[in-house]
A protein has these predicted regions:
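Conserved hydrophobic/aromatic "anchor" residues
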Residues: 46, 61, 70-71, 115, ...
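Structural microenvironment flanking redox-active thiols in thiol-disulfide oxidoreductases
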Residues: 79-119, 128-135
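Alpha/beta-hydrolase fold active-site loops
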Residues: 65-66, 97, 143
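Hydrophobic beta-strand core positions in alpha/beta domains
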Residues: 67-69, 101-103, 146-147
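Thiol/disulfide oxidoreductase modules built on the thioredoxin-like
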Residues: 114-122, 127-172
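Short active-site neighborhood of thiol/selenol oxidoreductases, capturing the structured segment around
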Residues: 56-79
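Active-site acidic short loop of glycosyltransferases
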Residues: 61-64, 94, 121-122
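N-terminal targeting signals for export/organelle localization
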Residues: 1-45, 49, 170, 179-184
């Protein structure tokens, strides 16, 4: 029987590993990865319902820079990122920026709504599904985050936990480049 010190070290190592590579229910494809997209392709449009039952489409955000985040309440790295996303929404929304969360929660709104209230999430959240995840390359690890430019094209993809400054630098780069006339 292992000692409590060994069990404690193992638990700490497991936690650190999950924070570095993200959460995954798939066989060990989890990784921390950043891809800046050189040739930007259109972000796939989708239609999902928010916590109030309203239909939300990604295309509703055209003209804005969007941080599209696939997450779940049980994902440790996701819990680290959410306060950053709340801050980004507050700081940059008046410059044409929006955060859109896509919860991949198995327990649906029953788990997500209380979490959103507890964390005072100020951005739109929808419940994701398999078809939407497949449209985005088969989201296998959480968090997976896409930065979408004002023209609705994928500019960057993050798989796993990225740094706050990494997100913020990319958001500012997209906000400051290629502003469209009349963009919010």
């Amino acid at each position: 029987m292992p000692s409590s010190a060994i069990r404690g070290r193992f638990a700490a190592l497991a936690l650190a590993t999950s924070l570095l590579v993200g959460c995954s229910s798939a066989p060990s494809h989890a990784r921390t990865e950043l891809s800046v997209v050189e040739e930007r392709k259109a972000a796939p449009d989708f239609s999902l319902r928010d916590a109030n039952g309203a239909t939300l489409r990604l295309s509703d955000f055209k003209g804005r820079v969007v941080l599209l985040n696939f997450w779940a309440t049980w994902c440790g790295p996701c819990k680290i990122e959410i306060p950053w996303f709340i801050e980004f929404e507050n700081t940059y929304k008046n410059r044409g920026f929006a955060v859109l969360g896509v919860s991949m929660e198995d327990d649906g709104w029953r788990a997500v709504k209380p979490y959103l209230r507890e964390k005072a999430v100020n951005y739109r959240v929808v419940l994701g599904d398999g078809p939407v995840a497949r449209m985005y390359g088969g989201v296998e690890s959480l968090p997976t985050t896409f930065l979408i430019d004002r023209e609705g094209r994928i500019a960057a993809e993050h798989v796993g936990l990225a740094g706050k400054s990494t997100y913020e630098d990319q958001i500012l780069g997209l906000l400051n480049s290629g502003k469209q006339a009349g963009a919010p």
